[in-house]
From Swiss-Prot:
The gene is STS-08. The record marks 78 as: Plays a critical role in the stabilization of intermediate cation. GO terms for molecular function: metal ion binding; terpene synthase activity. The conserved DDXXD and NSE/DTE motifs are important for the catalytic activity, presumably through binding to Mg(2+). A motif (NSE/DTE motif) lies at residues 217-225. The lineage of its organism: Eukaryota, Fungi, Dikarya, Basidiomycota, Agaricomycotina. It is an enzyme of class 4 (lyase). A motif (DDXXD motif) lies at residues 93-97. Gene3D superfamilies: Farnesyl Diphosphate Synthase. Mg(2+) 2 binds at residue 81. This is Delta(6)-protoilludene synthase 8.
Length: 342
């Protein structure tokens, strides 16, 4: 039996959901299904993950058109992860280059026979830029390309069975988890100048929230990953580095999460003032970052992504029966991606 520590019990930001959720979810999912990126069985498992719910919980105050960008982005993240998780670094490099090219030329048709990721990314970005401020567009591209590059690095790590320390693991996961382009969605209607946006206190908020997301994601995904033999998880890293049990690794991760919460609150309180107009935008953005860990935590238990239809029960009891181990199928490639469901 696996016991999940309640890392978010003291977090002051409470659950909120966007009122446009159902309407926008229907539109975004219909758009995504039109690409037929997965087999019918895998598409059904994908639907249980409810990535639009994640967006609605992460962006509870977003305008309808910006929630659509958030929903489409969550779907895009997922399909990129699924397609690249089964390929080596060279193939991932090719896929990433296609996606980057599509984002840079959103109004140009994609070549025939190209992997579907290119057209999904192109359509996503062509729609997003219609309602996004110029500064948010620039920052999104910068951070999303960094995420894509980290996908290639992760594939290279897989290829050589690289082992990380906690420090190096967190360093590579900060880009790989996709939080920074997700934060860019928070500023689609904003125009925060660079000298303020990159102020140390702002950078700290993003960093601490991101590492909280890494820990929370790895705690809830550990069961599936230990069963499939996927060791790209901070709990495996902690156990190996400190030669400790799973229970001790859980406790270490929870304690570090508490430290991150305290650091976040300290940085939040130290935020300078730049005048009424800028302060209101900074406040909106920082509140959005603070909400992300809460939204992610709620989605982890409200969707079927990690616990099937038992999420609400697990959220209350914190107890998860360990799944039996199964051999990882290393022969899978993008054309036969399999999304498992619980």
């Amino acid at each position: 039996m696996l016991y999940l520590p309640d890392t978010m019990s003291a977090w002051p930001w409470q659950r909120a959901i966007n009122p446009y959720f159902n309407e926008v979810k229907a539109a975004s999912n219909s758009w995504f299904k039109s690409f037929r990126a997965f087999s019918p069985a895998s598409q059904k498992a994908f639907d249980k993950c409810d990535f639009c719910l994640l967006a609605a919980l992460a962006y509870p105050r977003a305008r309808k058109e910006h929630l659509r960008t958030g929903c489409d982005l969550m779907n895009l993240f997922f399909v990129i992860d699924e397609y690249t998780d089964v390929e080596d670094a060279n193939v991932c490099r090719d896929m990433v280059d296609i996606v980057i090219d599509a984002l840079r030329r959103p109004h140009d048709p994609r070549p025939e026979g190209e992997v579907v990721l290119g057209e999904i990314a192109r359509q996503f970005w062509a729609r997003a830029i219609e309602t996004a401020s110029p500064t948010s567009q620039r920052r999104f591209l910068e951070t999303f390309i960094a995420y894509l590059e980290s996908v290639v690095l992760q594939a290279a790590d897989r290829d050589c069975d690289a082992e990380h320390t906690v420090q190096t693991y967190l360093a590579q996961r900060r880009d790989n988890i996709g939080s920074y382009p997700s934060y860019a969605v928070l500023e689609l209607a904003l125009d925060i100048p660079d000298d303020i946006f990159y102020h140390p206190a702002m950078n700290e908020l993003s960093l601490y929230a991101t590492e909280m997301l890494i820990i929370d994601n790895d705690l809830v995904s550990y069961n599936r990953e230990q069963a499939s033999g996927d060791t790209n998880n901070i709990l495996f890293v902690i156990m190996r580095q400190f030669n400790c049990s799973l229970d001790h690794a859980m406790a270490w991760a929870a304690a570090y999460h508490s430290q991150l919460e305290a650091r976040f609150m300290d940085a939040f309180k130290r935020m300078p003032s730049w005048g009424l107009e800028i302060d209101s935008q900074v406040e909106e953005y920082c509140q959005g970052i603070a909400n992300w860990p809460r939204g992610n935590d709620c989605w982890s238990f409200e969707s079927g992504r990690y616990f099937g239809d038992k999420g609400r029960e697990v959220q209350k009891t914190r107890c998860v029966p360990l799944l039996p181990k199964k051999e990882r199928d290393t022969s899978l490639r993008q054309q036969d991606v399999v999304i498992t469901s619980l």
